Amino acid sequence: MLGYGMYYNIVKGVETDLYARAYVLEDDKSGRKVVFVNAEMAFITIAIKRGVMKRLERKYPELGFAEDNVFLSAQHTHSAPGGYSHYGLYNMSTPGFVPEVYQYIVDGIVDAIVRADTNKQAGSIRIGRSSFAIDKEVAFNRSIKAYNRNPEVKTAIAEEESYAAVDRNMIMLYFEAKNGNPIGSVNWFGVHTTNISNDNHRICSDNKGYAARYLEESMMKKGHPDFQAAFAQGPAGDITPNWIVDRKKKWTRGKFEDDFESAKFNGKIQYDVAQEATDNAAKQEEIPAFIDYGLAFVDFRNVIIDPEFAWDDKEARTGPACHGVAFFSGTKEGPGMDPVVATLATTLARGIKTAELAKAKLSKPQIAKPILDKYRIQGKKDILVEAGECKILGTKDIKNLVIPNWADPAVHAFKKFHANGSLGNKPWTPQTLPLQIAVIGNIALVGVPGEITTIAGQRLQKTVADVLGPRGVDYVLITSYCNAYCGYITTYQEYQAQCYEGGHTVFGEHTLGAFQTKYKQLAIEMTKPFNDRQQLKNDQPTSFSDEELSKRSFNIRTQKRLIQIDD
């Protein structure tokens, strides 16, 4: 499975089916259309987006879809199959790329898009709103220490009041046919889809999947069997559904000891508020019939930060992806490496930093500069993995890494793939990412290729709203896990705490500033006439050959480690 990064978190059965829900929106006047997809999986990868586009363009060119107007998102369940990224790091616990899983996902998403386009009909869109009462046990901030560092937080919030460090609002797009019959809805609320823990072996759509089922079943009882309900993610980076410390498991859980019951409990709360948002939407005016979209590809290895977002750092920029010890240590709801090993890793990381900085002092400028830049850009992070430069603990000689194979099966897999040459010299995680904005009436959907924290999401919303507000955008909705996955996006202040989220904010302490800089640039282009816009696609993500992938593929039909489906 994908999400927890644990080698033992493998599939042995199926608890719920997994769905991709697609919504095609078309403006008859301009002829423009956009498709929004929400899939029950951990996150969209570049490989999945490319696979979907390749099939749509080859098999269904008449539908008029291109990468600019196809908006792929995921609801982030950690209990769905993994192995569908072409980048090495995200497949290490699988272990490897799994062609069958990749193909099933691509086929399912394409089928959903084609069905949605085939069944489209004249209708309207309304906005519904609701919120979670403070006593509803639905979401909690798992990184209060980092959250409280933000200047937006005027009074520090105590750990036991972490429910207050959450955006408790839900916003919905409600789709209605011309005859008044409901067609479907998409709502946004940020909370991790992690009620089901890393000791699970059954495929499940988790809390948001149950919420979607409850709303669809409710609509079916009202005579609307084709109603589709997507529970999409907002800024969920630091938000968990778990708050009770499980003494047996040594991590936090939801309402009940049975994780599936906790997921249903949380899903029911989300469903109840979604039902309120549905009722609210029915009372609202239709939004304007207008469609627009924009897409940019950005190489995040060297983004110069707009001074507006640089926090007085005149040299603020990003660098190649680095993962910190804090990332590998995990969270309250999903622990990572053993604390003793984490302490050792921290000591090694700091020792390597000292040695490299000493080397820089004695080296020529062309050798010293990359070293000095790395540690300045990454700030307080204790660097364990340099995914952008293909290093672990400062070395590219992965197969001879000092960490023994028995210490971590994922490390064993890394060594194996390095030895057979399948990792090559290409980055282990995406360095070039797609940024997407879709405008639907007076709403802007911002597709973020990663996990953005609560306050970081608010800042990004404001950045886009400041540009697109004057052209009629009243709402900016952050949609996480879109089109690709780069890890986390914390604020500059949160990053300094180096909690899990900061350790997984890979492009350095100014990562959010880089996203604000580039989304602002994309939004500015979208204020121009459609045909006068600059194409922001010179940078493209890394491509991998079939030969490279075959050397690190895990084929579920041929490998000795068989996946047994028991029902």
Regions found by a protein language model. Give the residues of each.
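Non-catalytic substrate/cofactor recognition surfaces at enzyme active-site rims
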Residues: 1-567
